[in-house]
């Protein structure tokens, strides 16, 4: 037996659609999927070039493509298109391991920090199509890293900060990452996680990695390879706060994400 809980009126009044509108949208999505998704893509995404085909499906070959011919950038859609109306509004609310550790990041701040890292990555030779491993704690810089990669067309691969050096190494090698973004240490449930040490151990068999960009999370001393490693703060400090986005095809890869086989 199930219970139905009615949505409070003060919340229902702020919903984008009502049940009748939802039913109509759902019906269209089933009966006219290309029309439906074309309307959604035009409404909610900023395109630099419109698509030629909404969807192309070959069930015999198992090939599916969306919005072929269209061009856009995920970073500009996540940040830039919101700036005219929301520059001073909060984009990210971050809370650290301790509830007292908190920060609110506006869209303008997010834009500038993402652009600074994007410029820093370009300075380190990262370009469109390159793979970047992100092995970080839950800090704002993790979001900046993903968005900065998207801005320059690099393909990011997020690896959970609780994974072992061997698991990290496997993912770096398989995805052919040449750059790693990490932190000196992470803090999880009051426990220190030796991220940079894990990265160094993982890279003992990853000869193609040429850059390790490290955020100072705890400030504790960590192993350092001056020929390869650079502090995140030093890389981004003097970078311009604007960065031209790379124009990407709709079917270009955005990220590589490995399952732990437990989900």
Where are these regions (language model features)?
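Adenylate-forming
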Residues: 29, 79-83, 110, 114, ...
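Conserved pre-ATP/AMP-binding loop-to-beta segment of ANL
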Residues: 88-90, 212-214, 225-258
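AMP-dependent adenylate-forming
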Residues: 78-105, 216-223
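A short N-terminal helical cap/helix-turn-helix that marks the beginning
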Residues: 30-52, 70-93
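Structural core segment of the AMP-binding/adenylate-forming
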Residues: 151-234
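Short, contiguous pre-domain boundary segments
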Residues: 1-24
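Conserved adenylation A10 loop of the ANL superfamily
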Residues: 99-101, 256-263
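Conserved AMP-binding/adenylate-forming core of the ANL superfamily
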Residues: 75, 92-147, 164-169, 228-234
């Amino acid at each position: 037996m199930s219970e139905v809980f009615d949505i409070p009126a003060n919340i229902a009044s702020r919903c984008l659609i009502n049940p009748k509108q939802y039913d109509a949208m759902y019906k269209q999505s089933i009966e006219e999927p290309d029309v439906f998704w074309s309307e959604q893509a035009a409404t909610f995404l900023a395109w630099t070039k419109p698509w030629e085909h909404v969807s192309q499906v070959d069930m015999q070959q198992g090939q599916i493509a969306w919005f072929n011919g269209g061009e856009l950038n995920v970073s500009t859609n996540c940040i830039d298109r919101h700036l005219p109306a929301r520059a001073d509004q909060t984009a990210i609310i971050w809370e650290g391991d301790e509830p007292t550790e908190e920060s609110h990041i506006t869209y303008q701040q997010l834009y500038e920090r993402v652009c600074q890292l994007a410029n820093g990555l370009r300075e380190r030779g990262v370009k469109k199509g390159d793979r970047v491993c992100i092995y970080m704690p839950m800090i704002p810089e993790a979001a900046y890293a993903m968005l900065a990669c998207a801005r320059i067309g690099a393909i990011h691969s997020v690896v959970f900060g609780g994974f072992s050096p061997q698991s990290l190494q496997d993912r770096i090698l398989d995805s052919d990452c040449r750059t790693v973004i990490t932190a000196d240490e992470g803090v999880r449930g009051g426990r220190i996680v030796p991220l940079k040490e894990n990265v160094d151990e993982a890279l003992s068999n990853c000869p193609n990695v040429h850059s390790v960009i490290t955020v100072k999370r705890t400030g504790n001393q960590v192993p350092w390879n001056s020929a390869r490693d650079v502090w995140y703060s030093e890389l981004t400090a003097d970078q311009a706060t604007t960065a031209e986005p790379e124009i990407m095809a709709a079917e270009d890869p955005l990220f590589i994400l490995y399952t732990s086989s437990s989900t």
